[in-house]
Structure formats: C-alpha cells, structure tokens
C-alpha cells in the first residue's frame, strides 16, 4: 500500500535538551486535531546496534553518543518502508543489558512520523528523508542538570558515573557531531519544550505540508 502523504519530522539536539518534551507535545496536540492513528513517534535510541554477541564487560564500553553506535542502515530502511506505506518492527533496546531485547514494536504507517534522537542530522540519508528537520538548542549546562536528575532518579545511576560519562563522551561528542549538525535544521528551537511559539510554528508547518500532499 502506497503512503505518499507520509511526513517525517526529525527532532534532534543535545541529550536532555527537550527533544522528547517537544515530540510528546506535538504528538499529543496533533492526536487531538487529526486522530492518534495519523501520527506516531519513533526514537533513534531503538536503533542502537545489537551487542548480544559481546560480553557485558565490552558492552558497557559503548559510546552511545557516537554515530558508530547506531544501526543506521536499519533505521534508513524502516523510514523508507514507512514512506512507501509498509509497517516496520522497531527494535526494543535495553539500557540494563546494553543490547537489543528479543522484542520489537510493530509500527504501522502514519501520515506523520516524529523521529527523535541526538544524532539524526549527522546522517545525510536521514536529512534527505526528513520533510522537516528540527534542532532543539538548549544550553549545555541546562542539559547536564536535566540529564543528571534523570539518570539518577530514573536509571539508578550514581552522581559520579553520570559526571564521568558526561566528561568522557556526552560533551565531546556533542561538540564534535551534534552541534555541527544544527546547520542542517530547517527550524532551530531555543529554550526547549517551554518555547510555545516555536512549537505552534512547527505544528503549523506540519499541517501545511499535510495539506499539500
């Protein structure tokens, strides 16, 4: 079944910049306007590479902020399938086991697909498939505080482990890969999920594209 009206919205930015908040807000509000069957969210995190062949001591060394950690070929294939009107089975990744689980999430074609992740715009193929590219531009100190709270409260991590990871990979990879990808964004949103005007503009552009299909 062809699905020529499928629109892909790529939302990227630093870890804890507010990407998920914006994605959820847009999803919820367009659900109310168009119906939830018309819109869905896919997270880039689901496409971290399968590491089941590695020992745990090797898995924990993964630099999750580097493009090489992603199974980008699978993501691209899934995006193309959705553009063509085909359903996909999205992997489920376990941060506890540092690899994919045996489960998948069945994702049916939608008129609007929100794709959310830190490294999306570093890949030219993703940029070409995205109809709208968004960069959430939040100061790094704010991102770090949010990440610290999230990882300690929701993932049971220690203060020192979060600080060590931030120094070793999160900040360096942001400066090397993520921040430079901002140049490819169609829309740059400062202040993250609290920027109501920018969210309204994004929604308006999505609806405009839908009407053109």
UniProtKB/Swiss-Prot annotation:
Alphabetic keyword roster: ATP-binding, Cytoplasm, Kinase, Nucleotide-binding, Transferase
Residues spanning the signal sequence: none
Keyword ATP-binding in record: yes
Gene3D superfamilies: P-loop containing nucleotide triphosphate hydrolases
Alphabetical GO biological process terms: CTP salvage; UMP salvage
The UniProt record lists the keyword Protease: no
GO molecular function, one term: ATP binding
Domain of life where this protein originates: Bacteria
Gene Ontology cellular component list: cytoplasm
Matching Pfam families: PRK
Enzyme Commission no: 2.7.1.48
Pathway(s) this gene product operates in, as recorded in its UniProt entry: Pyrimidine metabolism; CTP biosynthesis via salvage pathway; CTP from cytidine: step 1/3; Pyrimidine metabolism; UMP biosynthesis via salvage pathway; UMP from uridine: step 1/1
Primary location class: cytoplasm
Positions of ATP binding: 13-20
Subcellular location: Cytoplasm
Catalytic activity reported: uridine + ATP = UMP + ADP + H(+); cytidine + ATP = CMP + ADP + H(+)
Similarity section: Belongs to the uridine kinase family.
Name of the molecule in the record: Uridine kinase
Protein's organism: Haemophilus influenzae (strain PittEE)
Taxonomic lineage from the root: Bacteria, Pseudomonadati, Pseudomonadota, Gammaproteobacteria, Pasteurellales
Gene name in the database record: udk
